[in-house]
Amino acid sequence: MTYIVSLFLLGLVLGLVAVASNPAPYFAALGLVVAAGVGCGVLVGYGGSFLSLVLFLIYLGGMLVVFAYSAALAAEPFPESWGDRSVLGYVVVYTVGVMLVAGWFWSGWYETSWVVVDEFKEFSVLRGDTSGVALMYSYGGGMLIVCAWVLLLTLFVVLELTRGLSRGALRAV
């Protein structure tokens, strides 16, 4: 299980490097999907199965709509891919930077951070992430509604910002 979690962590770092190094919205959105997927895998490895499911469904269901609109409105005829020279330079710089930072902090966190949830499953009586579901829907119901409204407002703000010189998605007919 430790090898799978470390593979997910490597995929998370590569996905974030793909997001940070690419100026084209198509490939950056693909990097975000990869980073979200393997990030949810890391959460599952550390025992947050419900949290990772909620994160994955909300992220892919809600935020990819915004990415689809942004990519459609900022369409380029020849987008820069990961094989282009400028983007490849950023990929190399970010990867070397991550390796240097990991090498700098290697001895401090390596011994204690690789404990996954399967190694202590004999000691766990309840699931910590599922016990918060009732609180989220009872006491946190108002905040859940506020978050839904904020996501809707974010969608309209992104549509308004990416409309360019045209009249936008909301226009009088």
UniProtKB/Swiss-Prot annotation:
It catalyses: a ubiquinone + NADH + 5 H(+)(in) = a ubiquinol + NAD(+) + 4 H(+)(out). InterPro entries: ComplexI_Subunit6, NADH_UbQ/plastoQ_OxRdtase_su6, Nuo/plastoQ_OxRdtase_6_NuoJ. Pfam families: Oxidored_q3. GO terms for molecular function: NADH dehydrogenase (ubiquinone) activity. The chain crosses the membrane at residues 1-21, 27-47, 53-73, 86-106, 139-159. It is a multi-pass membrane protein. Its EC number is 7.1.1.2. Keywords: Electron transport, Membrane, Mitochondrion, NAD, Respiratory chain, Translocase, Transmembrane, Transmembrane helix, Transport, Ubiquinone. Signal peptide: none annotated. GO terms for cellular component: mitochondrial membrane. It is an enzyme of class 7 (translocase). Its main location: mitochondrion. Belongs to the complex I subunit 6 family. Core subunit of the mitochondrial membrane respiratory chain NADH dehydrogenase (Complex I) that is believed to belong to the minimal assembly required for catalysis. Complex I functions in the transfer of electrons from NADH to the respiratory chain. The immediate electron acceptor for the enzyme is believed to be ubiquinone. PANTHER family: NADH UBIQUINONE OXIDOREDUCTASE SUBUNIT ND6, NADH-UBIQUINONE OXIDOREDUCTASE CHAIN 6. This is NADH-ubiquinone oxidoreductase chain 6. It comes from Salmo salar (Atlantic salmon). The lineage of its organism: Eukaryota, Metazoa, Chordata, Craniata, Vertebrata. The gene is MT-ND6.
